[in-house]
C-alpha cells in the first residue's frame, strides 16, 4: 500500500507544472531633447517592506557602481522608516552632488492559475496501434505570478522626469534574482539612451 502511494505521489509530481521565470521590458520612455549624461545617482525604492527596499537599492547601487558611476542608496542616508517625499529626498541629497534620482515602484502583483489541457501522443507507434490511448500526457494546473515594476529617472537639478522603464517578471523565483535582472535592464537601457 505504501509503495502504491509513493508511486502515485511521484506520478502526480511529474505532472505538476514548474513554470519558468522570465523578465521582460514592457516599454521605456525618454524626455524629448534631454541630452545630459549623468554620473551620480541616488536610488530610491518605494517598496512597502523595508527589507525589500534596502535590498533593491543595494543591488541597483552596486550595478551602477560596476559601470563606474557614483551611486548611493536612499536607505544609507535616510532612516528606513522616514517618509519618502520631495522634501525628505531633497534634504537627504542636499550635499551629495547627485545628478539623477532613480525611483522604483511596484505597480502590481497578479496571481492566476491556468489549466494546461492534455496533449495527444503524435508518435508513429501510436498511429499504427489503434488500441493505444490518444492522450498520453494528462492536463495540469499552472500557477503564475506576474510582478510589474516601474523605474523612473529624475534630473536632480530640474526635478523633471527624464526617463522611465516598465518591466514585468513572470513567476519570480526570488526577490534577488528579479532585482538583478531588472538592474541589468535599467543600466542597459540608460546606456543605450546615452544617459550614462
Residue ranges and their predicted role:
Residues 26-31, 55-69, 119-121, 193-196:
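Short low-complexity stretches enriched in small and charged residues
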Residues 84-153:
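Surface-exposed short loop/turn segments
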Residues 60-65, 91-93, 120-125, 170-173, ...:
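Short, low-complexity, polar/charged sequence segments that are solvent-exposed and flexible
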Residues 1-5:
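Bacterial N-terminal signal peptides that target proteins for export
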Residues 15-39, 48, 136-196:
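C-terminal/domain-edge helix-coil "capping" segments
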Residues 38-113:
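N-terminal segment of the mature soluble domain
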